[in-house]
UniProtKB/Swiss-Prot annotation:
Disulfide bonds: none annotated. It holds the Pfam family Mab-21_C. SMART domains: Mab-21 (SM01265). InterPro entries: Mab-21_HhH/H2TH-like, MAB21L/cGLR. Gene3D superfamilies: 1.10.1410.40. This is Protein mab-21-like 4.
Length: 447
């Protein structure tokens, strides 16, 4: 294999496009964060009234990362607003369902109220509870997600009417008519200035205990020292999974991990913001078609951060974006995006997305990104030729047949094909060239 490819002069000329594109995104971050905080304040005001009507539902002011995450995005996917239940989760019975556990990493359970124990009486009323048979010696009955959602919906309607009547929220900011009860959440539209933000209101059971299944990922590199263990030692919450079942949720843990990546030097979060905007504007036609979500791209960044550990990987903006692109292309080609904390769970399985069509769009961008990056007439000009030739998809599919390819050296081969490897470490170059020799018959001769 020849030495790693060096950037061509044409590529060097195009580098400022990435920074112009990022600058345009950053110019929107502060207004987006302000819009979100105003909308969040409206919803929190309503939830305060919900709590006054029914103390079983708590207002949580402690989790301030949603505005940070919303500012990173260009997409308009719904934001979660969690409503904790006033219940001692450690006093409840966590009961596995009788059916076989699914193989997608989700831990499903019933929430049982024990016959022995005090302080749970508020959850044994008919509106949220289904009693067990008299023959069950341990369990009095179960807290039912569908019933909890129904109660919460009625409370939200009453709270919205109250807040509007007493001028606690701005006119037109929120309308009870927009409230929709879905299977696993309540959807609500909140107006903030000229922007309308969609929220998913989700009842959640806070737990102090972490999930044993997460212990295996606490040693992953790529994060500030000790941060992964500290974050994953926090409790794993429970949210509705169906009408009767609850499931573990790691969404908050993932957002905390994203925040930790933002404390590191380099363009990790910038690369995520760029791909989310390209996804929204180009791959999803300004949100008019179904496609990848911010959550998918966030997962790609988390994986890229443990695959590419050198500061040089993230020092240059274009190269940082391609660290995410090669991981994303591999996931699309193999039709498998592993959950970062539950790798056995495939986030693309059952998504209903046209993964083949999405792959073509992502590959087209990776090969010739300039057209999607031009946001001003002064950026018009001839695009350089495609960065890759044939054979890429066969190379990208290798991890499907041999999981050992899911490693830095393999992804370095992909980076070199896109001419953005730019790593001087001799051991890493040697490992990359060794993998290339194994894959050259499948990956083609271009490099």
């Amino acid at each position: 294999m020849p030495a790693p490819a060096l950037p061509t002069s044409a590529m060097a000329v195009q580098v400022p496009l990435w920074h112009h594109y990022l600058q345009a995104i950053r110019s929107r971050e502060a207004p987006r964060a302000q819009d979100f905080q105003r909308a969040e304040n409206v919803l929190l005001t309503v939830l305060e009234r919900v709590h006054a009507l029914d103390p079983r539902f708590i207002v949580d002011y402690s989790r301030g990362l949603e505005a940070f995450q919303f500012a990173l995005r260009s997409s308009e996917d719904p934001m979660d607003m969690e409503v904790p239940l006033w219940v001692d989760a450690e006093a409840l019975l966590i009961e596995e369902p009788e059916a076989t556990q699914p193989e997608d990493g989700l831990e499903l359970c019933h929430l049982g109220v024990p016959r022995e124990g005090a302080g749970l009486e508020r959850w044994t009323t008919e509106d949220t509870f289904t009693a067990s048979s008299e023959g069950d010696a341990k369990c009095r009955g179960h807290i039912v997600p569908s019933k909890v959602l129904c109660v919460l919906k009625d409370l939200l309607v009453a709270a919205i009417v109250h807040c509007k009547h007493h001028s606690l929220i701005a006119p037109g900011s929120l309308n009870a008519a927009s409230l929709r009860e879905e299977q696993l959440h309540l959807s609500l539209l909140v107006s903030s200035g000229w922007r309308t933000i969609s929220f998913h209101v989700v009842p959640v059971v806070r737990r102090k205990l972490g999930a044993p299944a997460l212990e295996g990922v606490q040693q992953m590199p790529g994060f500030p020292e000790g941060s992964l263990r500290r974050i994953l030692s926090q409790g794993v919450d429970l949210v509705p999974a169906s009408a009767q079942l609850w499931r573990t949720s790691t969404d908050y843990l993932l957002t905390r991990l994203l925040g930790e990546l933002g404390s590191l030097q380099g363009h990790r979060l910038d690369s995520l913001s760029i791909l989310d905007r390209v996804n929204h504007e180009s791959w999803r036609d300004s949100g008019q078609t179904d496609g990848l979500t911010f959550g998918h791209l966030k997962m790609v960044l988390l994986w890229a951060s443990v695959l590419f550990l050198a500061p040089e990987d993230w020092a240059e903006l274009q190269g940082a974006v391609y660290r995410l692109l090669v991981v994303l292309l591999c996931c699309l080609a193999t039709r498998k995006l592993p959950h970062f904390l539950h790798p056995q769970r495939n986030l693309l399985q059952g998504s209903g997305l046209d993964l083949g069509a999405i792959y073509q769009r992502v590959e087209g961008f990776a090969s010739q990104p300039e057209a999607a990056l031009r946001i001003h007439a002064t950026h018009l000009g001839r695009s350089p030729p495609p960065r890759i030739g044939s054979g890429l998809k066969a190379l990208l599919q290798l991890p499907a047949s041999d999981p050992t390819y899911w490693a830095t050296a393999y992804f370095d081969v992909l980076l070199d094909k896109f001419q953005v490897f730019n790593i001087q470490d001799k051991d890493r170059i040697s490992a990359m060239q060794s993998i290339f020799q194994k894959t050259r018959t499948l990956g083609g001769e271009e490099s």
